[in-house]
Amino acid sequence: MQNITQSWFVQGMIKATTDAWLKGWDERNGGNLTLRLDDADIAPYHGNFHAQPRYIPLSQPMPLLANTPFIVTGSGKFFRNVQLDPAANLGVVKVDSDGAGYHILWGLTNEAVPTSELPAHFLSHCERIKATNGKDRVIMHCHATNLIALTYVLENDTAVFTRQLWEGSTECLVVFPDGVGILPWMVPGTDEIGQATAQEMQKHSLVLWPFHGVFGSGPTLDETFGLIDTAEKSAQVLVKVYSMGGMKQTISREELIALGQRFGVTPLASALAL
């Protein structure tokens, strides 16, 4: 019998959660991560599944995700511990045939449950499936330090925030030309913040929760981690620049346009217009 802990998706989750912990983005039980799988991914590991998978209803049906398996982080679990005990901190779940709930097929031992942000993740998965024709498979939420810091000093406006991040590091416009969506402050772990995040995910692969953290979406764990890492690096540069008295010079609008043309991306118009 093949061991599911050696599968590409469990190993990928171990690496992503460990890297995020080492970055300082996921203190205590902060942050959560979900990866959409296919039946073929989990088929070799049926022998590892729970004999009687627990069923948990969703707070609202999500028929678009019917019969879809995911690997998810657990509620109250520490990213730093995933590498030590994957089965206690991760779980493979599968949405039922009508999208009304899911079974926990593997992991989340000792009656653990998926992340409290699962509604936000699943709603965002639905929107990114539609926005990318199924290409995006990962939703990652973390507490990226410098991005959070900027939400206290920059106007929490998509165009303003996006433009500052683009100017903070040349690669940013290439990596996230669609800009950064921003919510008002909202109570986490609710359907309301999940719906608001998903609405922004229709237009942006990055969504900021002011004074809290960031949501990122991408086709792979590496791409999604790299997306957040790129934005966070720019935020780190900006924090240093603002601490030194602000910008004396920066990347101009004309240079941003040239950058987009060189790499074949279309920058968010509202950010470019500032």
From Swiss-Prot:
Name assigned to this protein: Rhamnulose-1-phosphate aldolase
Residues given in the record as Zn(2+) binding sites: 141, 143, 212
Oligomeric and partner information: Homotetramer.
Pathway annotation from the record: Carbohydrate degradation; L-rhamnose degradation; glycerone phosphate from L-rhamnose: step 3/3
Source organism (scientific name): Escherichia coli O127:H6 (strain E2348/69 / EPEC)
InterPro entries (UniProt xref): Aldolase_class_II_sugar_metab (IPR050197), Aldolase_II/adducin_N (IPR001303), Aldolase_II/adducin_N_sf (IPR036409), Rhamnulose-1-P_Aldolase (IPR013447)
GO biological process: pentose catabolic process; rhamnose catabolic process
UniProt-listed Enzyme Commission number(s): 4.1.2.19
